[in-house]
Amino acid sequence: MILVNNPGSWAHIYWPLEHAPWNGWTPTDLIFPFFLFIVGVAMMFSFASRTALGATRAQLAWHVLWRSLIIFAIGLFLNGFPYFHWSRMRIPGVLQRIAVCYLVAALAVLAARRPADRSGRTGQRIAPVVVVTLVLLVGYWAAMTFIPVPGYGVGRLDPDGNLGAYIDRRVMGAHLWVQSKTWDPEGIMSTFPAIATVLIGVLVGEWLRSPRVPSGHGSRAARVKTAGLLAAGAAGLVVGELLHPFFPINKNLWTSSYVVFTGGFAMVLLGLCYWLIDVKGYRRWATPFLVYGTNSIFIFALSGLLAKASVIFKVTGPDSRGVTWHSYVYDKFFVPLASPINASLLFAIFYILLWLFLTWLLYRKHIFIKI
């Protein structure tokens, strides 16, 4: 997202680095659901390791709640920085959605856990998680399709006339994304299917941990895990495309077809990464992703803070007029190097490398900022 969110100029962007205008998808539209998916996968391994160390269900729930509150608060801080106009500050956001989805999905998982047996071991009931996931996806489709919106009618999926946008306006008023004004891409209604994205990751994580799946990286285990992920992922891609004519793939609405499609895509990517990294041992190419992942939310927040400061605070330009830090650096160091669209891309790549260097320093010193 750092690459996508920080071009040199918003007027010059290669199409894969832009979001789809409304229906449909681009590679950029895969990033957020992939992150939520992997949150679900990692959750199952984290809960298992904490439980093995003696953590109770209540302790896990408190940990999840505290972590969610911190992430949500960081998101609000980023939205308000630097002026904090509370009367019109945006309430939703990327980090806020991560916090809510993580919290609700984790509590659902914990509620579905089997009580400890005499030996102290617990187990995870999968059926309730599947049911919750299906209810979220089908219920969201039904609500968006059949509940009439005052002044617009029923079944509208355009930016202003859909049920989610109406609820956002009624509940949050002026506290919406400033560029859309009448709706929010991380709004209230679309958060429900986003929770399902995390739960799909939960199901995959639990399957990978299941005693019915061969453990380790031997040939049989590798075949089962890779084939399972690729097959399930391919099914998700096909089903998502089949649903598209009835409930279009749409990132802003986080439609049910979008959840199934991106969930399938994420499983395929996870299967390929597992095969390349864990089975074949091709690890070096993934080092930058590993380094970024060790402090992902911290770096996302800090890079967003600096990016926002760079377009607010000004310096004196060559003509003695005030220009933003962002414009000054871009115009002076990148515009002379290439065509406008390539100069814009070079700026974004430079920004990525800058934060990769900082993250690498933290990684080398084993500094991992836990949230």
Please place each PLM-identified region on the residue numbering.
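Membrane-interface helix-loop-helix modules in multi-pass inner-membrane proteins
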Residues: 47-111
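Membrane-interface helix caps and helix-loop-helix hairpins in membrane proteins
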Residues: 82-92, 245-256
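Kinked, hydrophobic transmembrane alpha-helices enriched for aromatic residues
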Residues: 1-11, 70-82, 239-243, 293-314
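Extracytosolic (periplasmic/ER-lumenal) interhelical loops and adjacent juxtamembrane/interface segments
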Residues: 8-25, 145-187, 314-343
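N-terminal signal-anchor module of multipass membrane proteins
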Residues: 1-60, 296, 302-303, 313, ...
